[in-house]
């Protein structure tokens, strides 16, 4: 899932959903 965060750039709204599996919700 960490790869998905990088794809979104970590700033997109979708990135927040990915953070759920990473660190931030």
Swiss-Prot record:
Main function: Mediates ssDNA packaging into virion, it locates to the internal surface of the capsid, thereby displacing the internal scaffolding protein B during virion formation. Protein J binds to and is packaged with the viral ssDNA. Additionally, protein J plays a role in viral attachment efficiency to the host cell.
One family name in Pfam for this protein: Microvir_J
Please give the Gene Ontology molecular function terms for this protein: DNA binding
Keyword DNA-binding in annotation: yes
Superkingdom: Viruses
Question: What keywords are annotated for this sequence in UniProt?
Answer: Capsid protein, DNA-binding, Host cytoplasm, Viral genome packaging, Viral release from host cell, Virion
State if Endoplasmic reticulum is listed as a keyword: no
| UniProt-recorded name of the protein | DNA-binding protein J
Source organism of this protein record: Escherichia phage G4
Q: Which family does it belong to?
A: Belongs to the microviridae J protein family.
One of the record's GO cellular component terms: viral capsid
Subunit annotation: Interacts with F protein.
Q: Which InterPro entries does the UniProt entry name for this protein?
A: Microvir_J-like (IPR006815)
Annotated localization: Virion; Host cytoplasm
């Amino acid at each position: 899932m960490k790869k998905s965060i990088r794809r979104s750039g970590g700033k997109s709204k979708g990135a927040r959903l990915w953070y759920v599996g990473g660190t931030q919700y």
